[in-house]
């Protein structure tokens, strides 16, 4: 789809959506996004130029269907997949990709750390994906030196970052905000550093006693990104890994640096979103969202969860969806899903489905609460179908039609019950919605209340057979 769109851009020094927007040019990607989001094209251009919206769209990701992440667009959901040294293979990851797209993921991150050829699995995923693909390049940087921190140098990081851009990665998590002076602030935490990328860089800085190379070479990374229109997802290496550590000095010190880096990237006309926590008590979620907006000049916020309790292993998709819905309501632009396997193991395809549906619910709830135009239309349509006992339409309008039908059919599988005015919860005699109270009945009742008062009412026969 995008071949003709990007043909004239290749070879230029800056092909980012922000660069074109700041020149007053509306790209084909902006037009596509405007149509998908039901927004004026001019507004999309203005939001991208300002940095409040990103359109992750690497010029080498040809089958991409462009989408937007930002406060002016609907709340988005990211799904994570990826092979590890202990589990999975390419076919399994492609199966997860298909499920993620089927159940509505807006973006997808390949977090593979080993067990497969990392370049091969990434290329396969990008070629098969219509949604933006993100990566964490420090994983492969470490893998390229066989896990040896001592052998890992600054150029290794930049080499892998550019390789990912060349392959068509749309956004990369760059852990440039973690500074060597932040590391002592971790003392006193219960869980310390829980970011894999942050952990790698912390070890590198402690071994070499040098500043974070992703920070010192940040302008070089910007030069790479703008040639491919790769978007920064600035990683939060010091995100809290438990409620105790939330909103602490370490987290907020890094956030301040992330804000500075956001503005540095914008000077290069490179798109930026900023990652956030993590594990956060419910009463601190609004503070975290507002603080990010303040420090990062309203760059789109992209949060992992946050989980609102630490005691839900096996159910962390539920705990985190609660926090995600709140974060979305307060203005977070994209929610990174959590699966039931979080903290326990590598998710399988069914875990991907469970996590994604939980987060589609959270994102949709946030859109409804923020009164986005048309956000509640589907809810109202399903409610009308429910009132009319149109079971097939209810299934069709559900976020997970297969699950809705499965649960209905467990007790009433015969086709005749698809027209029944009850389900197995209430049965035919106790469902309040099949009580035939009509508008005419209510009008008659209201007339009597207005003329006589409630104490003097005479019986009104309902339009219902007894």
UniProtKB/Swiss-Prot annotation:
GO biological process, one term: thiamine biosynthetic process
Amino-acid positions noted as binding substrate in the UniProt annotation, renumbered to this chain: 80, 109, 139, 175, 195-197, 236-239, 275, 302
Cofactor, how bound (note): Binds 1 [4Fe-4S] cluster per subunit. The cluster is coordinated with 3 cysteines and an exchangeable S-adenosyl-L-methionine.
Entry's Gene Ontology cellular component terms: cytosol
Disulfide bond sites: none
Pfam families per UniProt: ThiC_Rad_SAM
Recorded metabolic or biological pathway in which this protein acts: Cofactor biosynthesis; thiamine diphosphate biosynthesis
GO MF, any single term: 4 iron, 4 sulfur cluster binding
Cofactor: [4Fe-4S] cluster
Catalytic activities: 5-amino-1-(5-phospho-beta-D-ribosyl)imidazole + S-adenosyl-L-methionine = 4-amino-2-methyl-5-(phosphooxymethyl)pyrimidine + CO + 5'-deoxyadenosine + formate + L-methionine + 3 H(+)
Binding-site positions, [4Fe-4S] cluster: 423, 426, 431
Positions that bind Zn(2+): 279, 343
InterPro entries: ThiC (IPR037509), ThiC/Bza_core_dom (IPR038521), ThiC/BzaA/B (IPR002817)
Entry's EC annotation: 4.1.99.17
Protein name, entry field: Phosphomethylpyrimidine synthase
Organism: Prochlorococcus marinus (strain NATL2A)
